[in-house]
């Protein structure tokens, strides 16, 4: 089967589209401007990371279908530009979470790290203040200063939302967009939860093999696929990454190859050398190559 390596363009092109709030349509003219600039640099625009999913879709409230309609329009516009894969996530409130954005590695380098003990018993606002003071000028997606005012309100909205509720809301989202994706030739590649366990009492539904099996059962369409992020899934020692690649290989449409060093209750990101972390990067790449 012919495979190509796609690069997520959310990190390549951030001058315009990243300023659009989650839930707004990505206008065709802005998408085409992005396409032309990328192609002028000798690249091909095949994969977009990320078209963010509005919280009302995840909550499944009365506004959900309005925002799904907007998402569908964005899919159509990206399809017209030749995009074949959209990376997205279904994590409530926050995107990926770390407790230190500039941990000293002791060799002149810094890295992202997560320490579960620093989160226990703290509110998101308290954690934000700590991270902001020690972030070396960096920020996490979803943890931007301007969003802090709405965090308490969002947590109230998620009170009582269970894992099963979130799964059902994901199913509804995928059922709505699947026919459009099929028409446009676009695959959806969900990003795993990062870290792959619950934080702040919020439900998490893309953490392990069982979750991925459930995901693929929600919609009977090959548009429903996976972004295989080794750093996210690999933060849990219970995830056998090469085995997961072999199991879900025909639904892996995009991959993030990252290594992490795990310790009890926390982890940090590290170089791609297997010897520098807890992941066997050779076996991971070998499993992907053999698909």
Regions found by a protein language model. Give the residues of each.
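Single conserved hydrophobic/aromatic residue that forms the stacking wall/gate
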Residues: 2-9
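A short glycine/small-residue-enriched secondary-structure motif
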Residues: 42-58
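Glycine-rich, proline-tolerant flexible connector loops at the mouths of alpha/beta enzymes
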Residues: 16-32, 200
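Short beta-strand segments at enzyme active-site cores
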Residues: 46-50, 85-89, 186-192
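Histidine-acidic metal/acid-base catalytic patches
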Residues: 39, 56-60, 65-69, 76-84, ...
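Active-site loops and adjacent core secondary-structure elements that bind or stabilize anionic groups
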Residues: 12
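Active-site-proximal, glycine-rich beta->alpha crossover segments in alpha/beta enzymes
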Residues: 77-171
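Active-site-proximal loop/turn and secondary-structure-junction residues that shape catalytic pockets
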Residues: 18-19, 51-52, 90-94, 192-198, ...
């Amino acid at each position: 089967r012919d495979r190509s390596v796609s690069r997520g363009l959310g990190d390549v092109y951030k001058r315009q589209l990243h300023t659009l709030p989650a839930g707004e349509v990505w206008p065709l003219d802005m998408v085409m401007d992005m396409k032309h600039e990328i192609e002028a640099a000798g690249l091909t625009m095949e994969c977009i990371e990320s078209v963010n999913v509005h919280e009302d879709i995840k909550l499944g409230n009365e506004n959900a279908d309005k925002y799904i309609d907007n998402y569908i329009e964005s899919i159509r516009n990206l399809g017209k530009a030749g995009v074949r894969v959209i990376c997205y996530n279904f994590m409530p409130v926050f995107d990926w979470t770390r407790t230190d954005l500039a941990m000293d590695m002791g060799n002149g380098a810094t890295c992202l790290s997560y320490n579960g003990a620093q989160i226990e018993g703290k509110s998101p606002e308290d954690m934000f203040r700590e991270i902001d003071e020690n972030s070396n000028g960096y920020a996490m997606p979803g943890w931007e200063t301007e969003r802090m005012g709405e965090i308490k309100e969002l947590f109230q909205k998620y009170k009582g939302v269970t894992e099963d509720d979130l799964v059902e809301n994901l199913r509804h989202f995928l059922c709505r967009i699947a026919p459009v994706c099929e028409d446009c030739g676009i695959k959806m590649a969900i990003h795993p939860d990062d870290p792959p366990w619950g934080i702040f009492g919020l439900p998490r539904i893309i953490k392990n093999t069982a979750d991925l099996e459930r995901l693929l059962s929600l919609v009977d369409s090959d548009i429903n696929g996976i972004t295989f992020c080794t750093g996210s899934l690999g933060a849990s020692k219970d995830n056998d990454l090469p085995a997961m690649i072999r199991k879900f290989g025909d639904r892996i449409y995009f991959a993030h190859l990252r290594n992490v060093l795990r310790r009890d209750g926390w982890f940090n990101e590290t170089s791609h050398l297997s010897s520098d972390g807890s992941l066997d990067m050779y076996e991971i790449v070998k499993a992907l190559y053999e698909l």
